[in-house]
């Protein structure tokens, strides 16, 4: 096996102007949803604005990934509620943008170990979340129940689903456990505001063009500081491109897909060839 090899770059470009397709019917008059709409407009206004600004870098690509996997793009509102678009967010064992538990993340194909935590990668974690949400929707036949199940984790909501045929947009507050109803209401309230932020006094998002990179599969141990020196970029730039790396290093033989700044592959290959001879 070669020491390094090129791998295809992610094909999702995130440039679609239509991020919100309004596929989720929101029961907007539900008291609990209204409560959180008022909260985000008032006490939580600064938090909402800061989270949306932080999401400008990754939200377009996330929505494209969701749509490509058959999940409504608006489900990205989960990220707002779960992590405020903060990759290092962690709560009770859950981690990353989508706050997935390590076990669930691994089941969805993510790598989570001492060296790498792909829950912190906006592209890979969104693909895993889309797969998980799609599975939940296929089981419950409702995006509202899929939301509730996403939050419930191992706690069952199946009994609720069996007692009533839930259609998206129907009154749900009486059907879901209290904790799930609160969670779903937060997500739907955020979703509603994210559809028309200007209507509620928020600035129109200025979405950034998705970050480009040249991926290369590395099969030998490397430090990011070494690579940064080889290609003459700040190590912080490599950290930004490779958020899933926990220790700024690649485990030998792990086959890590290292992301390089565009145009730096040739420098990297020359330096790596020399490095491998030592």
Question: Where do the language-model regions lie?
Answer:
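Substrate-binding/active-site groove segments that recognize
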Residues: 93-115, 126-128, 133, 157-160, ...
């Amino acid at each position: 096996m070669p020491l390094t090899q090129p791998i295809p770059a992610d094909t999702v470009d995130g440039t679609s102007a239509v991020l919100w397709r309004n596929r989720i019917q929101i029961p907007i008059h539900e008291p609990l949803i209204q409560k959180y709409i008022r909260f985000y407009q008032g006490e939580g206004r600064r938090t909402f604005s800061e989270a949306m600004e932080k999401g400008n870098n990754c939200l377009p690509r996330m929505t494209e990934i969701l749509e490509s996997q058959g999940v409504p793009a608006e489900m990205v509102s989960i990220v707002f509620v779960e992590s405020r678009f903060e990759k290092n967010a962690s709560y009770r064992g859950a981690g990353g943008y989508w706050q997935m538990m390590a076990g669930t993340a691994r089941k969805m194909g993510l790598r989570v170990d001492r060296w790498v935590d792909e829950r912190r990668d906006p592209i890979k974690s969104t693909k895993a979340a889309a797969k998980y949400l799609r599975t939940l929707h296929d089981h419950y036949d409702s995006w509202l129940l899929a939301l509730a199940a996403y939050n419930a984790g191992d706690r069952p909501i199946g009994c609720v689903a069996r007692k009533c045929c839930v259609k998206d947009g129907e009154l749900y507050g009486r059907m879901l456990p209290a904790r799930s109803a609160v969670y779903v209401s937060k997500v739907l309230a955020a979703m509603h505001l994210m559809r028309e932020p200007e209507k509620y006094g928020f600035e129109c998002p200025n979405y950034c063009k998705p970050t480009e990179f040249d991926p290369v599969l590395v099969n030998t141990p490397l430090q990011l500081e070494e690579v940064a020196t080889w290609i003459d970029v700040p190590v912080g730039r490599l950290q930004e491109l490779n958020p899933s790396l926990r220790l700024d290093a690649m485990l030998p033989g792990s086959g890590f897909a290292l992301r390089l700044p565009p145009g730096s592959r040739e420098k990297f290959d020359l330096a790596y060839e020399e490095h491998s001879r030592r």
